[in-house]
A protein has these predicted regions:
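Gly/Pro/Ser/Thr-rich low-complexity, intrinsically disordered segments predominantly at protein N-termini
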Residues: 1-270
Length: 270
């Protein structure tokens, strides 16, 4: 890390270094295992978030929800791959999400993909979580990077408000679900669906006693499997006298539910 970085005084995003080759950025990211904490743009590396227990448990809670919902297609051609905080690359920028998911059967590309070769397909779902980072910054990253044309289909942005002493746990936690199919505002801006899953509603200060099933983010299968060939989702029947295999796609819930009660529980306990 930069010898002059004073993290206790830092305001995010924090410019760490300039004139850094992208390969060096990737090498350091892997070496220090800090995927998702910094990003690269035109040779400049900026720290955008600090690791915290609440941040990591929020990621883990959402990962668990998706894994449970898609368990019937695990290790099949209909599986959903957990890409974690894999580095993505465009001509000018390199960024990682806090987590992302890509269908096994989503085809590779000739150009415009999310890796240096341009052939790796973009994930269909990404999550971005801000704790030290501001709400405006995390939304900007989602809207100006992940949801650009040909990239992710759905994204979840989350802002966890840092607790104010003497509190030791956050009470205000807000999520926004973006989907490129959602109607935009009259001015063309994104119009994500908002969810309050903390213990206090950020809009009015009211207490929230969250219960299972009360705050659920729904991901449509058509969105999660965007770009997957139709013959993979609904394979043609074999010639007689063979019997058609079980339709695994039909075993999936539609929509895929992400119950934020369980995410809140993981964040605020122990």
């Amino acid at each position: 890390m930069h010898s002059k970085a004073r993290w206790e005084e830092a305001t995010l995003p924090y410019e760490l270094a300039t004139e850094v080759p992208f390969d060096t950025y990737v090498e350091r990211t892997d070496k220090y295992n800090i995927h998702g904490w910094w990003e690269w743009e035109n040779g400049t590396v900026r720290v955008i978030e600090f690791p915290t227990k609440f941040h990591e448990r929020c990621v883990g809670g959402i990962v668990d929800e998706i894994a449970i919902a898609t368990r019937t297609v695990k290790s099949t051609n209909l599986g959903i791959l957990n890409d974690g905080s894999t580095t993505t690359k465009t001509p000018r920028t390199g960024k990682e999400s806090d987590n992302s998911w890509t269908p096994v059967a989503k085809p590779r590309l000739i150009r415009g993909g999310c890796d240096r070769s341009g052939t790796q397909p973009w994930p269909n779902l990404v999550i971005e979580i801000a704790y030290s980072q501001s709400e405006a910054d995390v939304k900007r990253k989602v809207e100006t990077y992940w949801l650009q044309a040909g990239r992710a289909h759905d994204a979840i942005a989350i802002k966890i408000e840092e607790p104010v002493a003497p509190a030791t746990r956050p009470s205000v936690m807000t999520a926004w679900h973006y989907c490129i199919n959602h109607p935009r505002t009259a001015t063309g801006a994104f119009n994500p669906t908002r969810y309050e899953f903390g213990t206090i509603d950020s809009r009015n200060g009211n207490q929230i006693n969250l219960q299972p099933g009360q705050c659920v983010i729904n991901i449509q299968l058509a969105c999660l499997y965007h770009g997957v060939p139709a013959n993979v989702l609904n394979p043609p029947p074999p010639p007689p006298p063979q019997l058609p295999p079980p339709n695994l796609f039909a075993t999936l819930p539609n929509p895929i539910p992400i119950d934020m009660f369980h995410v809140q529980f993981a964040m605020l306990n122990n």
